[in-house]
Amino acid sequence: MNVRAAAANVLYQVVDRGNSLSTALPEAQQSIRPRDHALLQEICYGALRYLPRLESIAGKLMDKPLKGKQRVFHHLILVGLYQLGHMRIPAHAAVGETVEGAQALKGPRLRGLINAVLRNYQREQQALDEFSVSHNAGKYVHPSWLLKILQDAYPEQWQTIVEANNNKAPMWLRVNHAHHDRDEYLQLLKNANIDSTLHSEAMDAIKLAAPCDVHSLPGFEQGWVSVQDAAAQLSFNYLQPKDGELILDCCAAPGGKTAHILERVSAREVVALDCDEQRLKRVTENLKRLNLQAKVICGDARNPEQWWQGEQFDRILLDAPCSATGVIRRHPDIKWLRRAEDITALAQLQSEIFDAMWAQLKPGGTLVYATCSITPMENVEQVKAFLARTSAAQLVGSERENPGRQIIPGEEDMDGFYYAVLVKQA
């Protein structure tokens, strides 16, 4: 299929149908040549990153919106506008290929309209680009409800967060300590002419100067290295697992944190729990590549009686389901798929899982509550409420008035993440 047509289909699936980019994009990639996968990804990610700007330009250039069965052609126009405004593709190729996309989408009669819209944008680009950032939606390219949360929670930092969310994320690696230490792997990258830098705190983390195909990484197939953001790798620092312990990684998919524990310590057993059977397959695949063993269980964290093996855990990593507002730079569709009411519903779910997991923790054991969110309701307020109702919970490493650690997007080039460490008093 024509790459621009495939991109329009992805935008339609995400924006109009509410499907996630991580579902829609791989499906679309199956319809195009492998060599075009990166181009498709760049167009889809970029168009979703700057969606309100593209929408406002399209609105200016069209007499009436395309509706119903023609909506996919509206998204094809956005694909064309993104290429012309944000990519280095020659204008004639961007326009020509986008117009041809209408043919691939079985809308040959709309080719003239699409061509005219894109040509008019070329003629009036400067004025239209200025117009597209003249309102808050276009200037910050965040939904108003999320912008308000950020402004209220981070009065000094919200613009930094917005900017980080709108930039491309770097590629972080986690070196498998069972094979090499970080300095050794750094040398392997150097030998392969792959530029990289270290992280000051995440002891196995390496940041690549430019993203690359994983198969070009030394020893990827042999399990020497994995792709994982440095902020997620800090879960090991906070959990501090020890040899011989019984450890639970709750809401474990896709398994990066489970693997990190297994790479670093000889636990008696690590249990990887998740309620999503499809995503658990990723856990199994990742562990297989890394030649690691864990007990993988499909179950609801709120109902341990369905899966619990009868012995309390020494340590629990609760990577709670969340709004994922800390990883927008990796998943720009989150901005348009989430709603304000989702935060309240997620906070309730987190609270239920928190209580259920606490009951599975041994006296003297450690629970790390983690999210990849940056909303206070899911993080600081969640932990405060838990401490208020749980007398045996002792907060470690932070103050009760401001519990845990909030990492904001872009901080040492990390994703947004939250961690709070709690010990169960014996």
UniProtKB/Swiss-Prot annotation:
S-adenosyl-L-methionine binds at C251, A252, A253, P254, G255, G256, K257, D274, D300, D319. Its main location: cytoplasm. SUPFAM superfamilies: NusB-like (SSF48013), S-adenosyl-L-methionine-dependent methyltransferases (SSF53335). It is found in: Cytoplasm. It holds the Pfam family RsmF-B_ferredox. Its EC number is 2.1.1.176. Signal peptide: none annotated. One of its GO terms (cellular component) is cytosol. The active site is at C372 (nucleophile). Keywords: Cytoplasm, Methyltransferase, Ribosome biogenesis, RNA-binding, rRNA processing, S-adenosyl-L-methionine, Transferase. GO terms for molecular function: RNA binding; rRNA (cytosine-C5-)-methyltransferase activity. It catalyses: cytidine(967) in 16S rRNA + S-adenosyl-L-methionine = 5-methylcytidine(967) in 16S rRNA + S-adenosyl-L-homocysteine + H(+). InterPro entries: MeTrfase_RsmB-F_NOP2_cat (IPR049560), MeTrfase_RsmB-F_NOP2_dom (IPR001678), NusB-like_sf (IPR035926), NusB_RsmB_TIM44 (IPR006027), RCMT (IPR023267), rRNA_ssu_MeTfrase_B (IPR004573), RsmB-like_ferredoxin (IPR054728), RsmB-like_N (IPR048019). GO terms for biological process: regulation of DNA-templated transcription; rRNA base methylation. Specifically methylates the cytosine at position 967 (m5C967) of 16S rRNA. Belongs to the class I-like SAM-binding methyltransferase superfamily. RsmB/NOP family. This is Ribosomal RNA small subunit methyltransferase B. It comes from Vibrio vulnificus (strain CMCP6). The gene is rsmB.
